[in-house]
Amino acid sequence: MNVFKVFCLMVLLGWQLPAMAERIKDVSMVEGVRSNQLVGYGLVVGLPGTGEQSRFTEQSFKGMLNSFGITLPASLKPKIKNVAAVAVHAELPPFRKPGQTIDITVSSIGSAGSLRGGTLLQTFLKGVDGNVYAIGQGSLIVGGLGAEGLDGSKVVINTPTVGRIPNGATVERAVKSPFMQNDYITFNLNRPDFTTAKRLEKTINDLVGPNSAQALDAASIRVIAPRDASQRVSYLSTLENLEFTPADTAAKIIVNSRTGTIVIGKNVKLQPAAITHGGLTVTIAEQLNVSQPNAFSDGDTVVTQQSIIDIKQDDSRAFVFNPGVSLDDLVRAINEVGAAPGDLMAILEALKEAGAINGQLVVI
């Protein structure tokens, strides 16, 4: 009895893993099973006067007419306010076959005011290798709206220069997948972790058999798989639905210095530390005074400058962190002193420099 038959028998007998776990498919992806980016250049026509008359749009328009056997004089500059040059891009999902359709996004690359009401003409979508994998065409769905008055006033809602065409491109060429090329498949963890990799390896080995899975590093787990296509699909279908318990995430504090957003992981702990944080406000005002002499005197008008400096210090409070303080205690203590997000970022950075944070402080 081969490995695959034993594997199927064990599944039918009712293999169960602990609840409160994650499926393999939710924390990893199969190596080689990926989407591919496509991009193309095309023209959108039928715009209600919101197109453009740039040089490259004019050239593209003439090239399109030439492809239909219509030749315009070189000196002629057509008025094409209802045409816009656009970039078209799409994601080609794995295993998508010729004849199937994919969604495409159309974006203006010139000075067009809006793509609302326009239609994309036949556009070749190419991959990074230069081959055409899909052809796009169709009427755009544009969520934005723009309007401009004769006096130059303008109102723009959302983004009228970007639109989508659901199922707007037909796949012409399939991307070859390495899914069936080897005697094994490889799961790559979305978040590499040595503990998670070993737990996933053990979960598969406990089900399929010893040495069926091998953790190669913190991200990749190689699993022996049947060569037969039908068996491999069934085998992978069962494997990716197995449940196991991943390792806890690393203790991290994520700080976005631009927006003031702060995310603190549940595993963040603090060493003993005392903190005091007060606000010091310095205000400097400059005032010009004019000294005007009396009439019929020999004095000169003099301008003097007076500086007024005011310093205000807010009351500050000190608080102490005991060993092993958790996220809840940290947030509660920070809120008690009324710290703003900017103050909190300064406090966290100071704690990290003092070695009081058991975890990573990541500033993005």
From Swiss-Prot:
**GO cellular component labels:** bacterial-type flagellum basal body, distal rod, P ring; outer membrane-bounded periplasmic space
**GO BP, one example?**
bacterial-type flagellum-dependent cell motility
Q: Does the keyword Zinc-finger apply?
A: no
Which keywords, in A-to-Z order, does the entry hold? Bacterial flagellum, Periplasm, Signal
- Signal peptide feature range: 1-21
The record's InterPro entries line, in alphabetical order, gives: Flag_FlgI
Does the keyword 4Fe-4S feature in the UniProt annotation? no
Q: What compartments host this protein?
A: Periplasm; Bacterial flagellum basal body
Superkingdom of this protein's organism: Bacteria
GO molecular function term, any single one: structural molecule activity
The subunit field of the Swiss-Prot or TrEMBL record says:
The basal body constitutes a major portion of the flagellar organelle and consists of four rings (L,P,S, and M) mounted on a central rod.
Q: What is stated as this protein's family in its record?
A: Belongs to the FlgI family.
Q: What does this protein do?
A: Assembles around the rod to form the L-ring and probably protects the motor/basal body from shearing forces during rotation.
Checking HAMAP family in the record gives: FlgI (MF_00416)
- The name this protein goes by in its record: Flagellar P-ring protein
Q: Which organism is it from?
A: Pseudoalteromonas translucida (strain TAC 125)
Q: Which gene encodes it?
A: flgI
